[in-house]
């Protein structure tokens, strides 16, 4: 879950403020969703689930509550439950990027790699100009040891997000897996040139020799 950088104390202060508002307006869905989002930032998965369930009891199709609940359930290793929520979101909004990505990784954790690849393919078809679609599919392909196709997807993602050095590192790892060590070293060199500290890449550099 991405959010603006705040300290844990700032998140707790936000939670206290939201709780005060909920005491005044206990039936406002927006407040319960805000509370769930803050609880996720505080890694309080069970409390976040309670807030999501409060919303879903009144509005069973609420997309934000389903998404937050899926995320929390994955953190609690309840991947089958997370899968159900992601699928419900996608029934309502088939092009929901984050839910499709969440479903792909949930299926990986459930060791349903072929299903994960199917959804990753759908993701790329629906979002051909989004680098995350290609990185998600590449992640599945790496799990399946389909390194050639993973390399293609890393390269597509890099073309869409050329300043993302993590993609270069992933590409280098894939080239190493393919035995293409010189190309891997050149890719690592580019990542260093673009700002990645070389010291963090020493283990990979060693594998290119």
Residue ranges and their predicted role:
Residues 1-46, 50:
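N-terminal leader/linker segments that initiate helical-solenoid repeat arrays
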Residues 41, 75-76, 109-110, 143-144, ...:
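Register position in tetratricopeptide repeats
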